[in-house]
C-alpha cells in the first residue's frame, strides 16, 4: 500500500479545502493510505515542509495542493513558478515523488473552483503511480529483454 502525505495551502481555503476532500477520497479509491496532512499558510510555503516529509519512512510520496488566484500584479505568477521549481528540486533531491496539485497561475476564482476535483485527483493519482513504479523499478533486473515499468 502506498503511503501518502498531503500538503495543503490555507490561502484560498474555500478552494483548497475542497481539494483536500477530493484528494482524500481519491487516495482511498486507489488503495493508498494518507499518513500525514500538513497545512501551510500558502503555496509559497509548501516547500518548507516537503524535505521533512520526504525523509519520513512512512511516506512514499507527497501530494501538494493549493490555489494561486490571479491578481492585478505578477505576484501569482512569481509564487506559482517559484513554488513549482522548488517542489521539483526537492522531489529530485529526495528521490521521492512529490506531485504538483496547484491550480494557477492565471486562474480566477471561478476557474479554480472548476478545477478542484481534476487537480486534486491527478496529483494523487500521479503520486500513487510514481511511488508504485519507483518500487518496481528498484526491484527490476534486466534479463536480456526490455524491462517495461507501468
Swiss-Prot record:
<dbReference type="InterPro" id="IPR036467">
    <property type="entry name" value="LS/RS_sf"/>
</dbReference>
<feature type="binding site">
    <location>
        <begin position="67"/>
        <end position="69"/>
    </location>
    <ligand>
        <name>5-amino-6-(D-ribitylamino)uracil</name>
    </ligand>
</feature>
<feature type="binding site">
    <location>
        <begin position="72"/>
        <end position="73"/>
    </location>
    <ligand>
        <name>(2S)-2-hydroxy-3-oxobutyl phosphate</name>
    </ligand>
</feature>
<comment type="function">
    <text>Catalyzes the formation of 6,7-dimethyl-8-ribityllumazine by condensation of 5-amino-6-(D-ribitylamino)uracil with 3,4-dihydroxy-2-butanone 4-phosphate. This is the penultimate step in the biosynthesis of riboflavin.</text>
</comment>
<dbReference type="Pfam" id="PF00885">
    <property type="entry name" value="DMRL_synthase"/>
</dbReference>
<dbReference type="InterPro" id="IPR002180">
    <property type="entry name" value="LS/RS"/>
</dbReference>
<keyword id="KW-0686">Riboflavin biosynthesis</keyword>
<comment type="similarity">
    <text>Belongs to the DMRL synthase family.</text>
</comment>
<protein>
    <recommendedName>
        <fullName>6,7-dimethyl-8-ribityllumazine synthase</fullName>
        <ecNumber>2.5.1.78</ecNumber>
    </recommendedName>
</protein>
<feature type="binding site">
    <location>
        <position position="115"/>
    </location>
    <ligand>
        <name>(2S)-2-hydroxy-3-oxobutyl phosphate</name>
    </ligand>
</feature>
<dbReference type="InterPro" id="IPR034964">
    <property type="entry name" value="LS"/>
</dbReference>
<feature type="binding site">
    <location>
        <position position="100"/>
    </location>
    <ligand>
        <name>5-amino-6-(D-ribitylamino)uracil</name>
    </ligand>
</feature>
<dbReference type="GO" id="GO:0009349">
    <property type="term" value="C:riboflavin synthase complex"/>
</dbReference>
<dbReference type="GO" id="GO:0009231">
    <property type="term" value="P:riboflavin biosynthetic process"/>
</dbReference>
<dbReference type="GO" id="GO:0000906">
    <property type="term" value="F:6,7-dimethyl-8-ribityllumazine synthase activity"/>
</dbReference>
<feature type="binding site">
    <location>
        <begin position="43"/>
        <end position="45"/>
    </location>
    <ligand>
        <name>5-amino-6-(D-ribitylamino)uracil</name>
    </ligand>
</feature>
<keyword id="KW-0808">Transferase</keyword>
<feature type="binding site">
    <location>
        <position position="11"/>
    </location>
    <ligand>
        <name>5-amino-6-(D-ribitylamino)uracil</name>
    </ligand>
</feature>
<feature type="active site" description="Proton donor">
    <location>
        <position position="75"/>
    </location>
</feature>
<comment type="pathway">
    <text>Cofactor biosynthesis; riboflavin biosynthesis; riboflavin from 2-hydroxy-3-oxobutyl phosphate and 5-amino-6-(D-ribitylamino)uracil: step 1/2.</text>
</comment>
Amino acid at each position: 500500500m502506498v503511503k501518502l502525505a498531503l500538503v495543503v495551502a490555507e490561502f484560498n481555503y474555500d478552494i483548497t479545502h475542497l481539494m483536500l476532500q477530493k484528494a482524500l477520497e481519491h487516495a482511498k479509491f486507489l488503495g493508498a493510505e494518507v499518513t500525514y496532512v500538513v497545512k501551510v499558510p500558502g503555496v509559497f510555503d509548501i516547500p518548507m515542509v516537503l524535505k521533512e516529509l520526504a525523509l519520513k519512512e512512512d511516506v512514499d510520496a507527497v501530494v501538494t495542493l493549493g490555489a494561486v488566484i490571479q491578481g492585478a500584479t505578477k505576484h501569482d505568477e512569481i509564487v506559482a513558478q517559484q513554488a513549482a521549481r522548488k517542489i521539483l528540486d526537492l522531489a529530485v533531491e529526495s528521490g521521492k515523488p512529490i506531485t504538483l496539485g496547484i491550480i494557477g497561475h492565471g486562474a480566477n476564482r471561478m476557474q479554480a473552483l472548476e478545477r478542484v476535483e481534476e487537480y486534486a485527483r491527478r496529483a494523487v493519482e500521479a503520486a500513487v503511480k510514481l511511488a508504485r513504479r519507483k518500487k518496481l523499478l528498484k526491484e527490476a533486473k534486466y534479463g536480456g529483454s526490455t524491462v517495461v515499468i507501468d
